[in-house]
Amino acid sequence: MKKRIICICMAALLSLSFLAGCGAEGNTDTEQDAAAQTVTVRLSEVTHSVFYAPQYVAMSQGFFADEGLDIDLSNGGGADKVMTAVVSGGADIGLAGPESCIYIHGQGKDDLPVIFAQLTKRDGSFLVGRTDEDFDWSNLKGKTIIGGRKGGVPEMTLEYVMRHNGVEPQGDAVVDTSVQFNMMAGAFTGGQGDYVTLFEPTATEVERAGHGYILCSIGEESGEIPYTAYFAARSYMDAHPEVIQGFANAIARAQQWIVEHTDREVAQAIIDQFPDTDLDTLEAVTARHRQIDAWNAAPMMARSALERLETVMTEAGELTKAQWVDFDALVDNSFAEKAMESMK
């Protein structure tokens, strides 16, 4: 009898072990299936800035994850470098000024980059000077402004605004284009130039450190232009339309999320992206971007906005009217439009 009881107990234990093993195996299969369904997207951004808050909101709020996307984010350090990464296959999607796409289209390459979503709708940089002056654009005459890479949207927009305020670049004032984009703040605080254009949170950090003063928003002066947008090689878009659609969906949700939430809530959502910046600074910077209406509320690009950018490029001498790109060849709004439809 005793032996029989022992045998029954051992059989029960073996059954429980088998069931537990099946359960563990089932969980592993589920986890593996979930991992298999997640697609890693290599995203190269032109710089790391609060200006791109909707992107970081999409990451922190799980909007990309909801679409089965895992974002591998890298800082390209300039639009030209982002474009190089995309066309060489080093990145799947790029975030930079559309001018980089326009230049490539003018070269007649086979696998051209195509814009599928717009993130920001005006220049997000701020003019920083060495004194807390009562600023007028005429103050730039006889001075040197660190303006970024020649042919880049920040530099061209600065020159566009200067001309429209009666200051001729390289005539009335010098626009220094020798400093790399990610070195501009360091050059200015190191004593180079009289003014510099900086993105946030760098502009506020320079001001709070006592190295300069924010004088005006370049974007408020320039008007709306498609300042930064997402693009991918046509071959990648054709091969992975579901990835592009999911990406556009996440960005559209994030843009709407920002509209519906306070500056403090936006700052809290993106703070992990800026570990060296405190919450109050991020809130102030977010408010500044909202005040100048920097972010798109929807990811579609307007034809008129692209034409204004091409006007800026033409006035800068980087593009002739004959080199203007066909809108439909450069921009595919279908993904952005579907993203907005899915939110209704």
Residue ranges and their predicted role:
Residues 182-274:
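Pocket-lining segment of extracytoplasmic ligand-binding domains
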